[in-house]
Amino acid sequence: MKRRALMAAATAAFLMGVCGMLQAAPVAEVISYGQSGLKASDARIHEAIKQAAQMRKWGIVSDKPGKVLLVYPTNNRSLHYQATVSVTYGKGSYKVEYVKSRGLDEKRNGCYGKEGVVCVHRNVNRWIANLGKDLNRILSQSY
């Protein structure tokens, strides 16, 4: 009986460890709009960034010419976790880059055995990808 309980506890601990590892993923980069071949003015890209941020409920922390700093989420969940991204734009294109996070399992010194790779909770990549999709859709509607 003791052996069964010990085996069950060991299995549960192993599965919890594996599930925890599956939560982290390397940060992905969003392909910029300018690489699609279409061009938009900097003013139009800036407006699209603000629209997409509002649609996805990202908060604007800093808004300077050529660079907008966004955080997600902006509701009560932000007390527990938050991701920060930078959207740089100019010359008809933009780029969404991960900056930092809090409470999202960030590992800056490498993950999955790869040095220099930043890993965060897998949802961060989805949030960034959705923001990028909305930006591309908004900018594509301009033409």
Roles of regions detected by a PLM:
Residues 23-143:
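Ser/Thr-rich, low-complexity intrinsically disordered terminal regions
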Residues 9-18:
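Bacterial N-terminal signal peptides
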Residues 5, 20-24:
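Extended, compositionally biased intrinsically disordered regions at domain boundaries
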